[in-house]
UniProtKB/Swiss-Prot annotation:
Keyword Isomerase applies: no
Family statement drawn from the similarity comment of this UniProt entry: Belongs to the ubiquitin-like protein UBact family.
GN (gene name): ubact
Protein name: Prokaryotic ubiquitin-like protein UBact
Organism annotation: Methylacidiphilum infernorum (isolate V4)
Its job: May function as a protein modifier covalently attached to lysine residues of substrate proteins. This may serve to target the modified proteins for degradation by proteasomes.
Segments of this protein annotated with the region Disordered: 1-65
InterPro entries listed in its UniProt record: UBact (IPR037543)
GO molecular function: protein tag activity
Length: 65
């Protein structure tokens, strides 16, 4: 049994890659990423210390603060 695989000589079309825009960019009709501010880490850590001090410490280590 012989399997014929299409090659570029046999008419397979090459797809041209179009670079995608960065996050939040793009002027196309598709959905766009929301433009949101980065949360204030000091406020997050203060709230986390009230709830669970150990979790706040682990978060601080994980984020490099």
């Amino acid at each position: 049994m012989e399997v014929n695989m299409p090659t570029t000589e046999q008419g397979q079309k090459n797809k041209q890659m179009i670079p995608s825009p960065g996050p939040g960019g793009g002027s196309g009709p598709g959905p766009q990423a929301p433009k949101v501010e980065k949360p204030n880490t000091e406020e997050i850590l203060k709230r986390m210390r009230k709830v669970d001090p150990d979790q706040a410490r682990r978060y601080r280590q994980r984020t490099g603060e």
